[in-house]
């Protein structure tokens, strides 16, 4: 906790140029490689090898003979799986759905996080500590637990909220159409506000206080200081949290999968790209196609993150 | 920054797939010994058996005592990922000889080449089981396992509420629709049936009962027919339930699903033997108000029900398929084994797939659940004897079912009709089979 509350150094402007590294001799380079060996081995074993395996899987397809019961053959089919994925309407629909949903939800979540961080920045230090801890609680609760908690609140058969609404004489529903997204968005925002607020708050703390004094001398009110000084100086962290959240949304899996238990007709098995991949691999048993889908998702996510970073960075500078 | 937490969640799935990888690296000795066995093996052998049914382990001990020649090593494979573990074990060459699996998975495993053809060594046991049960272990006409249990379809309904709304237990599906409408005239909120948004099994049951054949093996190819008159007749009942809002849509995965019936908002359900043991805990408020009846029929003169089957599949690489079949047949058909397993004390929840179930019915009925107005034992025995034996699982049934699940949700939300779904599934299934190198044509 203490490490979180301490203001972190955030790169808002490009720091002074680092001195160019000393030309290391061959021996030095060799030693350097040795130091990175543990990392490299782990990286190879847990990233490169599985991705390579997935890639080789994705170049194959399972074929049967006769009536289809009995031995199967795994045959090399080149990029045929990738061609199918690229033309797979359901896969791209899930991607579009997740992106559209994510862009709205992330904007709302970061907006609230920013607002709270700015408010916290304006109050006394003791209160800050309390509110920070309180707002961080949703993040501390394991995602599965908090999703289950919301699941009980949303459940069409057992929700206390529905009971209350019924007693008040109205009928509400948490799923179907736009409601599905509102319910899921509420859950993700509830989970995400605390952590994003901490990051934004930390970078606010790192801003030099003299700026505010100067602004006050010039007659600026608090909201003006917030809008014209604080926000422009923390765009770096906003872009960063935005990008991380975007990547997170494209990998959205556990929450909708759990929510599907109570709203299967609203959250389909291909609701998000990850759910579609999971279904293909573990329900249908088509590992090869699922591997191709995973790789396409990874590449698409990488491109999107890059574009997002480029576009937002250009706009800010 | 919730992507960390999302990742943590996703890592559950990742861990599952990683364990597959690790398992795949683990073994590797002689996985290619899957020659078709015809002769009996000799000498003393030990074979591994996976199951997750309560009470089975005790039975294997009984067997082991009586059969020193064939020793069974029991492994409790309980868990959500049992089938995934089994797949990984086969690929790694460390699979057990015999494993519990449901009929749908048996077909799925067989289609993926993960089972052993035991047609020749198992033929001698065929007569012990119902024709429908033997079909379930013989997809495409090749036998890959031995039937274990069945769960024939019948109806349970709230007799108290039926009386209150002035309706009777429906004899046909049309009766059910009419009764549902009549009940809604008395109470707008009441539903006569439930169809979960994730679960097209209602349509499977209806189609099975109507005599439809989604998959039919003909010589060297499959005839795929989701739009035959029988299939459409079944689909039409679902459509009427949806159009008239006669069914609730409680998901079977919803923790509160049983409240729907216990509180009386939904007043009837089709059900089966495997559910009987859980009634007592799940229906505390409506205990004693229930009554059993035959499932609604399409043709009361020719009653036909459906059933899921529990099976024992013989896996690829099993060296002693004859012994595995012998043990499996003893476990699932001998009087000695079934008397113990159908006793509620064993907690197996098993209902046998043998031709004569009458000795085992009485004990599985939770008497305090029902009002005693109908002969529960007769309902269950009849349902078991009426299971239609035309139903076949095709080689891409699991993939088809997953595709159907996606569209089923849309049907429940009235975005598409059942007929549109069936038409599109038929095309999808034929294309998918042809894609996998299997000959298939659309039926009608």
What is each stretch, according to the model?
Chain B
Residues 103-153, 205-207, 291-293, 377-379, ...:
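Hinge/lid segment of periplasmic solute-binding proteins
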Residues 142-148, 153, 177-224, 230, ...:
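Extracytoplasmic/periplasmic solute-binding protein
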